[in-house]
Design a protein with these regions (language model features):
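Blade-edge motifs of beta-propeller repeat domains
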Residues: 20-33, 68-84, 118-136, 166-183, ...
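Beta-propeller blade termini
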Residues: 36-43, 87-96, 138-146, 186-193, ...
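Glycine-aliphatic tripeptides that mark coil-to-beta-strand junctions in extracellular
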Residues: 47-53, 98-104, 150-154, 197-203, ...
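Residue-level detector of functionally pivotal "anchor" positions at catalytic/ligand-binding pockets or at interdomain
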Residues: 376-389, 489-513
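Recognizes extended acidic, P/S/T-rich segments that occur
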Residues: 416-463
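Beta-strand-rich modules
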Residues: 460-480
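Extracellular fibronectin type III
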Residues: 475-494
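C-terminal outer-membrane/trafficking sorting elements
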Residues: 496-575
Length: 575
């Protein structure tokens, strides 16, 4: 009998340890903020994540500040950043100098503002006159290299307009006529929905009367609206994340529906440019963030939603554990409730699990800093993925594809791993694309996925003649980066072959044949390249020889390259 009670006691103690409060409210020195934005970034490249925070302070005044992480303690640094409220911010190394820059949009006493700050190092930030759209309160913005030239580009939406800016690579930006719908109180997110190597754009918000969601498929820099049954929402968030680890990005949307009732939706990506509603059982939430995160280091993306719920005065912050079978269970995390909220996740103390900053209004303006103590509560410590290898390159004119073998990870499924590329014109340089990671250790400077997404390849267009050197790292669901691979290289020759982004190959697919139309009289070379950059076959085509058999091709995505009279045309082909 004594042994029986001892067993029960040990079981209870184990359960108490397992379900002990995983998030510890920690004194951080961060000010109480509402109607704002917050982000982790290693601004001084010292291998720990600093914090930038902006919004409305406890006296209802605009506020903005940077806090340096000193071994887990945060120190306010005078930077001269102009305060904004009702704001959004986004981190990127827009000038490829190895320091994390940021853009912020919102309002202050002078009206609507959008500011770009260049990080000069040592917490010195220079305000850059970029000429960005002043979108106003409740707007959003996001960085991505939409045209595959290595430089981060920027989309801004709010006040019924959406504007895309192409990074010229010289510190300036050019407005692009992309045909994107104008929105109010939007949420924006970039992600490769069709796994073709181009970042696609997800938008959710007020498009005129009710909440709408739009997906723009990026086809070599041209955006085409995808017809879907996805329902959008107003005053919430929209994010990409691979919830079921099938290699396809799923969607999380929160906000208010047409009846002004808070909702939370999950849509599963079927892998064929269609999406299915997933009954995830989430509580409807608006006026706050929605995050895909792996808080428990099991390799599955969990969900946090914070903000206003249905009913007068109701608000909550809820954490949902991914059960690994496409369903979610609420986890009793004990997080503070707030609306007009913002959040940031990152491993600030480098202990192998991601921690949480939560800001918002819960009677008063508040900021909570939660240290994730799951490792001490019998959860596993995260480890980095293996280093990518088997680097491969395909080069045609000023076009190049680099690819690699997929990594593995002890916690994250292989399909969930994202990849991050650094590349420059000299060994070890990043003047073509920045990884926002330490090149020596792989330590991440931001809490984000890799710049290649879940693809095992990355496309570059409009490259200048010269030598190129690149390395690749793998990043798991908890944003832990592997070391970088061995260095690969390739050369772009100064040939007369030029790509044309706006002309496509004119072709039709008939069964197992590709029929090429409008070919020149002179013979041209057609190359079929797999999505990961491997050359499958080459053919000489002409007016009299315009059919290519595809019987031997496996189902998948391929790129057709037609070198026609010194002009390289490219089109995507799906078998």
């Amino acid at each position: 009998m004594k042994q029986f009670y001892t067993a029960i006691l040990l079981s209870l103690l184990a359960s108490a340890t397992l379900f002990a409060q995983p998030f510890v409210n920690t004194v951080s020195g961060l000010p109480g903020i509402g109607r704002g934005a917050v982000a982790f970034a290693d601004f001084d490249n010292d291998h720990d994540l600093d914090v930038i925070i902006s919004g409305q302070d406890i006296n209802y005044n605009p506020y903005a500040a940077v806090f340096r992480n000193d071994a887990g303690l945060f120190t306010h640094i005078e930077t001269g950043i102009i305060p904004l409220e009702n704001c959004a911010l986004a981190i990127a190394d827009y000038d490829l100098d190895g320091f994390q820059d940021f853009v912020i949009t919102g309002v202050n006493l002078e009206g609507s503002k959008t500011f770009l700050y260049r990080n000069l190092g040592n917490f010195q930030f220079e305000l850059i006159p970029a000429g960005f759209y002043n979108a106003g309160a409740g707007s959003d913005l996001a960085w991505a290299d939409y045209n595959s030239d290595g430089f981060p580009d920027l989309v801004i939406s709010g006040n019924w307009q959406t504007k895309l800016y192409s990074n010229n690579g010289d510190g300036t930006f050019a407005l692009v006529e992309a045909g994107l719908v104008g929105m109010n109180t939007p949420s924006l997110a970039w992600g490769d929905a069709d796994n073709d190597g181009d970042p696609d754009l997800l938008m959710s918000g007020d498009a005129g009367s009710v909440g709408e969601a739009y997906i723009y498929i990026n086809d070599q820099g041209i955006f085409n609206l995808l017809e879907t049954q996805i329902e959008g929402a107003v005053g919430g968030d929209a994010q990409w994340g691979d919830a079921d680890n099938d290699g396809n990005l799923d969607i999380l949307i929160t906000g208010k529906d047409a009846s002004l009732i808070p909702v939370s939706y999950v849509y599963r990506n079927n892998g064929d440019k269609t999406f299915s509603f997933a009954n995830a059982g989430l509580v409807g939430t608006a006026l706050g963030p929605a995050n895909w995160i792996d808080y428990d280091n099991d390799g599955d993306l969990d969900i946090m939603v914070a903000g206003q719920n249905a009913g007068c005065g109701n608000a909550s912050t809820r954490l949902y554990t991914n059960n690994g079978i496409g369903s979610f269970s609420e986890f009793p995390a004990g997080l503070a409730f707030a609306e007009r909220a913002a959040s940031a996740w990152g491993d600030y103390d480098n202990d192998g699990d991601i921690d949480l900053i939560l800001t918002g209004i819960s009677g008063i303006h508040t900021t909570k800093f939660y240290r994730n103590d799951l490792i001490t509560n019998s959860f596993q410590q995260n480890t980095p993925p293996t280093v990518p290898d088997n680097l491969y390159t395909y080069v045609a004119g000023d076009y190049a594809v680099i690819s690699w073998a997929r990594s593995t990870d002890a916690q994250s499924p292989q399909n969930s791993i994202t990849y991050n590329v650094m590349m420059g014109n000299n060994p070890g340089s990043i003047n073509v694309i920045s990884p926002m990671s330490d090149a020596q250790t792989g330590k991440r400077h931001t809490s984000s996925t890799g710049n290649a997404g879940q693809n095992d390849f990355l496309v570059f267009r409009n490259l200048q003649p010269g030598d190129y050197y690149f390395r690749v790292q793998a990043i798991d669901q908890a944003y832990e980066g592997s070391a970088f691979s061995q260095e690969g290289s390739f050369t772009v020759l100064g040939t007369d072959v030029k790509t044309n982004e706006h002309r496509k190959i004119d072709f039709n697919v008939l069964g197992d044949r590709i029929i090429l139309n409008n070919l020149p009289e002179k013979p041209s070379k057609l190359s079929i390249v797999s999505a990961d950059g491997k050359l499958i076959s080459e053919h000489t085509v002409s007016v009299s020889n315009s059919e290519i058999g595809t019987q031997k091709l496996l189902p998948g995505i391929y790129i057709l390259h037609l070198n026609s009279e010194g002009l390289l045309l490219s089109s995507k082909f799906v078998k």
